[in-house]
C-alpha cells in the first residue's frame, strides 16, 4: 500500500472498530441498526457519536436484540435504503434466521463481523468460529488483515453488494481484539472522492417496494406445487450465479479503488514470496503479518517458503488459489476455527477441495491456532513452516496440528 498521503486525505491513528465506523460514515448510509456485543461494542459507540454529532446523516434504530437488527434492515433495504450493521459471536447466532433470509431476498446489506470464538466454554476473545459457522448461508465474506484494509474494504463492500450482477449482502470480517482494539495508522479518504467512487445510489433494487409495481417478496415457494416446481430451483441457481459473479466484481472494484486512492489490496488472494517457493502456508485475517515475518526469516535462511493469504473467503477463489499453489510440493493451512466433523480447520477443508482440481496432488496439513484470543506469533509460524517443509521433503501423514496446545 502507498505510504504517501493524498492531498485531500486525513491521517488517523485508530483501531479497526473506529475504521469501520468511519467507512460507514463515508458511504453515506441511510439506516444503521445495531445491538452491542463484545468485541463489536465500541463500533456501535462510534456510529452513535457520528450520528449525534451530525457527521453521519443516518437514522439509527435501537432494538432489543440482534434478531430485530436484521429484520429492521431488511425492511429498510426493501424501501431502497443503504444500510449497515455489525455483530459477532452469540449476537450473530441470535440473528441467524433473518441472516439466512437476507441473501435469499438478494438484499445488498453490508455487515461487519468482529470475529470471536463461540460458546462453550465461555469466551469473548478473538477467533473465526462465529463467521466460519455462517459461511454457507449465501453472504459474500471478506477478511481483513489491517486497520486500513477494514476501512477500505467496508467502503468497497457497498459497491460490490449493490452491483446489479451481484445483489447480495456482504460481510466484512475483522479479527476481534487484534484489529477491533489494536490501533494503527489509517488514511481517511476525502468524502467527495468516496462519493465519486461509489457513484449515485441506485435505489431501484429489484425488490424495492413500489405501489405502482406490486410484487410478492419472499412468498411461500415449494419444490413440489406452489407457484411452480421449478421456481425454488431457479431462485437458488440465481443466488449461486450472483455469488460467482461477485468474483469478477470484487476484482474490478478493488482495481478501481487502487487507481483512485493509491492503495492496492488483493481482491481474492495475495501471493507473498511465492516466486520459486518449494512449499507454502495459507493464512486468513490478521495472523498474516506474523506469518509474513516467518516466511521472510525462512527465506533469509535459504528455505524456499511462500505464503498465500485468502482475502475473499466466500465465494471461495478456487481458480486463483489453485494457480497460486500450482508449483509447490506441500501446503500448510492455518485456521483460527475448527470444523468439528472433519477434525481440521474450515479454510483447510476449502483449500484441499480446491486443490482437487489441480493438475497434481499436493499434500496439505491443517494447523489450528489463535482460538479464544490466543496469540499466533512468528514462532508459531516458524513451526508451521518447519512441519510443512518436512511434509514437502519427506511426505508422510498430514495430521492436524494444534498450535497453542502447550502454550
Q: What are the functions of these language-model segments?
A:
Residues 1-133, 138-139, 155, 175, ...:
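Thiamine diphosphate
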Residues 13-20, 255-279, 292:
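Glycine-/acidic-rich phosphate or pyrophosphate-binding loops and their flanking alpha/beta elements
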Residues 43-46, 72-74, 95-99, 120-126, ...:
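Short acidic, glycine/serine/threonine-rich loops at helix termini
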Residues 48-53, 250-252, 256, 293-307, ...:
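Short helix-loop-beta junction
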Residues 125-169, 173-176, 200, 360-374:
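Conserved thiamine diphosphate
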Residues 170-270:
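Conformationally flexible catalytic loops at phosphate/diphosphate-handling active centers
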Residues 269-303, 316-323:
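Redox- and metal-dependent alpha/beta enzyme cores, enriched for Fe-S-associated oxidoreductases
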Residues 335-407:
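Peripheral docking tails and interdomain loops at the edges
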Amino acid at each position: 500500500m502507498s505510504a504517501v498521503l493524498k492531498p485531500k486525505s486525513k491521517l488517523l491513528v485508530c483501531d479497526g472498530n473506529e475504521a469501520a465506523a468511519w467507512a460507514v460514515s463515508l458511504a453515506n448510509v441511510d439506516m444503521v441498526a445495531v445491538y452491542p456485543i463484545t468485541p463489536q461494542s465500541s463500533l456501535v459507540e462510534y456510529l452513535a457519536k457520528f450520528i449525534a454529532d451530525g457527521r453521519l446523516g443516518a437514522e439509527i434504530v435501537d432494538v432489543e436484540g440482534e434478531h430485530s437488527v436484521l429484520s429492521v434492515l431488511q425492511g429498510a433495504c426493501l424501501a431502497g435504503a443503504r444500510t449497515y450493521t455489525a455483530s459477532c459471536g452469540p449476537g450473530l447466532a441470535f440473528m441467524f434466521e433473518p441472516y439466512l433470509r437476507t441473501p435469499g431476498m438478494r438484499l445488498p446489506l453490508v455487515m461487519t463481523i468482529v470475529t470471536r470464538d463461540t460458546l462453550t466454554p465461555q469466551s469473548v476473545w478473538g477467533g473465526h468460529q462465529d463467521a466460519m459457522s455462517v459461511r454457507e448461508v449465501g453472504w459474500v465474506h471478506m477478511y481483513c488483515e489491517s486497520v486500513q484494509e477494514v476501512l477500505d474494504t467496508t467502503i468497497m463492500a457497498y459497491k460490490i453488494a449493490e452491483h446489479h450482477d451481484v445483489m447480495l449482502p456482504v460481510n466484512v470480517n475483522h479479527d476481534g481484539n487484534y484489529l477491533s482494539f489494536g490501533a494503527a495508522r489509517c488514511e481517511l479518504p476525502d468524502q467527495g472522492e468516496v462519493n465519486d467512487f461509489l457513484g449515485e445510489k441506485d435505489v431501484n433494487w429489484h425488490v424495492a417496494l413500489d405501489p405502482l409495481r406490486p410484487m410478492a417478496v419472499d412468498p411461500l415457494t415449494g419444490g413440489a406445487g406452489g407457484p411452480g416446481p421449478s421456481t425454488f430451483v431457479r431462485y437458488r441457481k440465481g443466488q449461486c450465479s450472483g455469488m460467482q459473479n461477485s468474483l469478477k466484481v470484487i476484482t474490478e472494484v478493488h482495481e478501481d479503488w487502487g487507481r483512485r486512492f493509491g492503495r492496492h489490496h488483493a481482491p481474492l488472494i495475495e501471493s507473498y514470496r511465492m516466486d520459486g517457493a518449494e512449499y507454502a502456508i495459507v493464512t486468513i485475517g490478521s495472523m498474516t503479518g506474523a506469518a509474513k515475518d516467518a516466511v521472510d526469516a525462512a527465506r533469509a535462511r535459504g528455505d524456499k517458503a511462500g505464503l498465500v493469504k485468502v482475502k475473499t473467503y466466500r465465494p471461495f477463489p478456487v481458480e486463483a488459489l489453485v494457480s497460486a499453489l500450482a508449483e509447490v510440493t506441500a501446503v500448510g493451512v492455518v485456521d483460527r476455527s475448527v470444523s468439528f466433523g472433519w477434525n481440521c480447520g474450515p479454510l483447510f477443508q476449502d483449500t484441499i477441495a480446491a486443490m482437487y482440481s489441480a493438475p497434481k496432488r499436493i499434500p496439505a496439513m491443517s494447523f489450528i491456532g489463535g482460538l479464544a484470543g490466543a496469540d499466533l506469533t512468528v514462532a508459531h509460524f516458524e513451526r508451521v513452516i518447519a512441519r510443512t517443509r518436512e511434509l514437502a521433503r519427506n511426505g508422510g501423514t498430514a495430521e492436524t496440528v494444534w498450535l497453542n496446545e502447550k502454550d
